Amino acid sequence: VRIHPFRALRPIPERAAALSVPPYDVVTTEEARALAQGVPDSFFWVTRPDIAFPEGEAAPPERQHETARQALDRLIRQGSLVREEVPVYFLYRLIRKGRPQRGVVACFETADYGTLIRRHEKTRPDKEEDRQRHVAALRTHDEPVFLLCRDRSDFTAFCDQQEQAIPLYDFTAPDGVRHTLWPVREPDRLAPILERIPCAYIADGHH
């Protein structure tokens, strides 16, 4: 699987917890609105722009996507989001109910979809089209695609070493999940490990 570092647009450390939100499709409009209330840096203003409109108003998708873009621009303008100067991999660990999961935040090549990157279920065309329009309006991929692969001892050893460093982010979300992220400043050390992944399966983020 071809996986690459990238110039991330990411939160500054002191705003990471406030910006962090669950995936857009696991909460209702009412739940997202309640969670974002009084939190101007909540990323729900980007991923769930419907909450910016009066309750009961069904704003056209085009207006919602433009509202999302305005919210993203505001977060960048005020300095809550910053761009990495060079391409970087990120090592990401989350701990839920005592069980850790590790992964890499990176970019993969869409040309590998259908061969090296495989889906596990069918998706709805209307949802796919809406997400495409959302990403196009933002000119930014605001939510990750979640890929799974088999455990690898070389990756585990790499993670064990990297996790000795001070993380960029380390916070516990309201749902009790702890999120920790380390930048991998030497991508040439990680790249050979990722190149040996034979295939990956799309677990989420494709709707």
Where are these regions (language model features)?
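A cross-family signal for N-terminal binding/gating loops and helix N-caps
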Residues: 1-207
